From Swiss-Prot:
It comes from the Eukaryota. Pfam families: EF-hand_7. The modification N-acetylalanine is found at residue 2. Ca(2+) 1 binds at residues 21, 23, 25, 27, 32. Belongs to the calmodulin family. This is Calmodulin. The keyword Ribosomal protein does not apply. SMART domains: EFh (SM00054). Ca(2+) 2 binds at residues 57, 59, 61, 63, 68.
């Protein structure tokens, strides 16, 4: 399944994996998974975290290594983001709930994810998504970015 991923996707997932793998030991524990999910505004229970890990933990050792993570991501991409998941993600970014993602809101979420971006990088991300040129990202623009293949 993971063999259907492009090199670019694998590189992106490697970066994401590193964000989860706080201690850099090459595996993701339930604790690390919980930390990242909470930084994204989710509040999973210990049992839910364990379920998520068990779903992809092929060798049954209780943690996720990179190949297992790739399998999980490939599976998720196959179920391509449902409308509801995209809406949920938009709400995480749109802190003040005004229907737009501003540069400040984007910076805030990326910082919570451990991504220290320069103002230029944040502005560049907004510009890439901002189809109507109003300096922020509305829901339609967000959907375009999230569903772009």
């Amino acid at each position: 399944m993971a063999d259907q991923l492009t090199e670019e996707q694998i590189a992106e997932f490697k970066e994401a994996f590193s964000l989860f793998d706080k201690d850099g030991d090459g595996t993701i524990t339930t604790k690390e998974l919980g930390t990242v999910m909470r930084s994204l505004g989710q509040n999973p229970t210990e049992a839910e975290l364990q379920d998520m890990i068990n779903e992809v933990d092929a060798d049954g050792n209780g943690t996720i290594d990179f190949p297992e993570f790739l399998t999980m991501m490939a599976r998720k991409m196959k179920d391509t983001d449902s409308e509801e998941e995209i809406r949920e993600a938009f709400r995480v970014f749109d802190k003040d709930g005004n229907g737009y993602i501003s540069a400040a809101e984007l910076r805030h979420v990326m910082t919570n994810l451990g991504e220290k971006l320069t103002d230029e990088e944040v502005d560049e991300m907004i510009r890439e998504a901002d189809i109507d040129g109003d300096g922020q990202v509305n829901y339609e623009e967000f959907v375009q970015i999230m569903t772009a293949k």
